[in-house]
């Protein structure tokens, strides 16, 4: 078959260990720095932006949203929904508001989604939770100017799974106009053979059922615009996954752009969304302004 299937176990582990590929910091240090940067950015956002925190979209302890609101009182703003990474087993919405200030200042509401991470959460449940959060937002803000998904790493996987949702079973259809998928994993099968699955305990069936690469639907007439972004210093496997998922969407008729972001690694590619002038911040604002 070639590719990841032919890699020795140790090499595959390395490919799916994003912290080993950062030229800025050591493996452990870059993860701690990422948690610190996103937590501090979220604290700054909560201090400077009007918020509705811990809004429940379901009965579960983690089924809550943090909403960062622009000044528009009519609720006709566009909504960016941010889905955090952490390999489906760490981080939370409480480190996920760092991108709010530059977007809210331009009239965009930002929503950070909480979901049950492993080992409490399993993959099917996480996907359902994120989908339910979108249905909840569609009902809460029926007059919004569209929903834009933004997911990082495991969150990009969950955002990609949202794109293949049959909304009939969720009671509401969100008006998803765009998706920004940052340094994601779109085929879960290689993950089965790495340390990442120790906490997830996925079977091959679960991995296949929840792999966006295997769930690419033909684009609807009003299909949203998708940006697949990857870091210069992501691993070759992460870069391959982004490339192949973008190509699969394009082959199915979706409007897709691929962005290779220079000078960043798997972590600061998303951390820099706290900056007004950062390329991805500008891409998101441009996507929203075109809709």
Regions found by a protein language model. Give the residues of each.
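Alpha/beta-hydrolase superfamily serine-hydrolase fold, recognizing
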Residues: 1-291
């Amino acid at each position: 078959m070639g590719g990841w299937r032919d890699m020795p176990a140790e090499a595959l582990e390395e490919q799916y260990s994003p912290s080993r590929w950062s030229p800025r910091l050591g493996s452990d240090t870059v993860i701690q720095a990422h948690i610190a940067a996103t937590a501090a950015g979220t604290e700054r956002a909560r201090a400077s932006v009007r918020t509705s925190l811990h809004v429940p979209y379901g009965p579960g302890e983690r089924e809550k949203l943090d909403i960062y609101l622009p000044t528009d009182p009519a609720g006709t703003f566009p909504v960016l929904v941010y889905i955090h990474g952490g390999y489906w087993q760490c981080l939370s919405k409480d480190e996920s508001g760092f991108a709010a200030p530059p977007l809210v200042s331009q009239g965009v509401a930002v929503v950070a989604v909480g979901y049950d991470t492993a080992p409490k959460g399993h993959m099917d449940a996480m996907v359902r939770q994120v989908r339910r959060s979108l249905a909840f937002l569609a009902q809460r803000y029926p007059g919004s100017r569209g929903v834009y998904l933004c997911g990082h790493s495991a969150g990009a996987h969950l955002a990609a799974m949202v794109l293949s949702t049959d909304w009939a079973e969720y009671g509401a259809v969100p008006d998803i106009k765009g998706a920004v998928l940052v340094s994601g994993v779109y085929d879960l099968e290689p993950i089965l053979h790495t340390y990442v699955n120790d906490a997830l305990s996925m079977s091959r069936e679960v991995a296949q059922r929840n792999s966006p690469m295997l769930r690419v639907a033909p684009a609807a007439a009003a299909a949203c615009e998708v940006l697949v972004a990857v870091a210069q210093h992501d691993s070759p496997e992460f870069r391959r996954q982004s490339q192949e998922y973008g190509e699969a969407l394009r082959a199915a008729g979706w409007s897709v752009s691929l962005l290779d972001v220079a000078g960043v690694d798997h972590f600061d590619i998303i951390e820099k969304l706290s900056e007004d002038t950062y390329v991805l911040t500008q891409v998101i604002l441009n996507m929203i302004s075109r809709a």
